[in-house]
């Protein structure tokens, strides 16, 4: 045998075909088993969740959408259902948080680190920085 020669050894094809066929069958069996497991799991899950509500659901369908009656609550007051109560501005309550309608004063804003800001300021630079700061505040608010 010389260094660059290659001998082709024939491999029986029938053996590979049966092996591939077995693998294909096994895959199909696994798929079938998995789908059956999923179906039984879903049935159990659906049945478990719906059994407790099925009586209420049937009663609601029998009664119709407009005829659903809720038990009377003694603590409920008709004054609480007034729409103006929910949508009226509540000015008598003190709110300690920030008012977002008003921009904060510049004295409250944090100062940038000294290495970020150039030492010498021209009046035009200050105007540009204030304009940029105001636009940033408008975007965030």
Swiss-Prot record:
Q: Which Pfam families match?
A: PNRC
Sequence ranges of Polar residues compositional bias = 11-21
Q: Mostly located where?
A: nucleus
**GO CC annotation:** nucleus; P-body
- Which top-level group of life is the source organism from? Eukaryota
Q: Name one GO biological process term.
A: nuclear-transcribed mRNA catabolic process, nonsense-mediated decay
| Record-linked InterPro entries | PNRC-like_rgn, PNRC1/2
Extent of motif SH3-binding: 101-107
Q: Which UniProt keywords apply?
A: Activator, Cytoplasm, Nonsense-mediated mRNA decay, Nucleus, Transcription, Transcription regulation
> Where is this gene product found?
Nucleus; Cytoplasm, P-body
Please give the residue ranges the record annotates as the region Disordered. Answer: 1-51
Q: Which family does it belong to?
A: Belongs to the PNRC family. PNRC2 subfamily.
> What is the stated purpose of this protein?
Involved in nonsense-mediated mRNA decay (NMD) by acting as a bridge between the mRNA decapping complex and the NMD machinery. May act by targeting the NMD machinery to the P-body and recruiting the decapping machinery to aberrant mRNAs. Required for UPF1/RENT1 localization to the P-body. Also acts as a nuclear receptor coactivator.
What is this protein identified as?
Answer: Proline-rich nuclear receptor coactivator 2
Q: Which organism is it from?
A: Gallus gallus (Chicken)
